[in-house]
Design a protein with these regions (language model features):
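N-terminal small-domain helix-loop-helix segment of the aminotransferase-like
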Residues: 2, 9-105, 112
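Short catalytic/ligand-binding loop motif for oxyanion handling, primarily in non-cytosolic enzymes
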Residues: 44-48, 181-184, 219-220, 248-249
């Protein structure tokens, strides 16, 4: 017998996936160069040459049993240390490898985090507009999913609306900056205001309210725009990162929490 709630989550088709399949069909007829695919987030820019060079070097110089074998449950230590060292150098933070878990891209990382926060009756808040898969991820984990309207026309976080929607059952706020689909980058001023609000509400309710920072687009900014690193502004932040966008590697499924 099938789990009815799980079946219900997968019963409705994704229009994004349907568009991707349609694009593949059209490409077979008119040629891929004549199809402009705005469905999935597949890159149109090749991965950096250093990625291919590194893959070749690893294949040539490393024991295949190590390449294709299991790692520790939390991921290879050297990889976690490299990530930690990189973030420390870029953002002036003091992370250690033990704080990181290697994941198969941001989506399963988010699912794991949602499940970890899904105590009975818990809820999670997203800021509109949001990546559509957040909702089924949260519902599958057993979380109530609520949406905070954006501050129009800036699309920054509407802190007044956020405060009205936070309850004692609120476990986390999920943020995506730069945002998919709006492209907005939440400013440091906005994030500091959110941090102050969450610190106050956490103290009021007697438990931490986390920020889940979904950051696959962290490096994809232009015109000198800077993306604030949220852990620098709010202690109870869980970062879910993927190299799918920054290195054009969506098929490799590499990321970290």
């Amino acid at each position: 017998m099938l789990n009815p709630s799980a079946y219900a989550l997968g019963a409705n088709r994704s229009c994004i996936r349907d568009l991707f399949e349609y694009g593949c069909q059209r490409a077979a007829v008119v040629g891929r160069e004549n199809v402009y695919d705005y469905s999935l987030g597949n890159p149109s820019i090749p991965s950096p040459k250093e990625v291919d060079e590194t893959v070749r070097r690893i294949l040539d110089d490393t024991d295949s049993l190590l390449i294709h074998g299991y790692t520790s449950a939390v991921g290879d230590y050297a990889t976690r240390k490299a990530i930690s060292d990189d973030l420390n150098a870029r953002y002036g933070v003091s992370t250690v490898p033990e704080e990181f878990f290697i994941g198969c891209g941001a989506a399963p990382e988010l699912v794991s985090v949602f499940r970890a926060l899904a105590v009975p009756g818990a809820e999670i808040l997203a800021v509109a507009p949001y990546f559509p898969e957040y909702k089924p991820f949260a519902q599958e984990a057993g979380l109530e999913f609520k949406v905070v309207p954006a501050d129009i026309p800036s699309f920054q976080i509407n802190l007044t609306a956020m405060e009205q929607m936070i309850t004692p059952s609120t476990q986390a706020i999920i943020l995506n900056s730069p945002n998919n689909p709006s492209g907005v980058v939440y400013t440091e001023e906005t994030l500091k205001g959110l941090a102050a609000l969450l610190e106050r509400k956490s103290k009021e309710y007697g438990h931490p309210i986390y920020i889940i920072a979904d950051e696959p687009y962290r490096e994809l900014v232009y015109g000198g725009v800077k993306v604030p690193f949220i852990p620098c502004l709010y202690k109870n932040t869980i970062v879910c990162y993927s190299y799918s966008k920054s290195l054009s590697l969506p098929g490799e499924r590499i990321g970290y929490v």
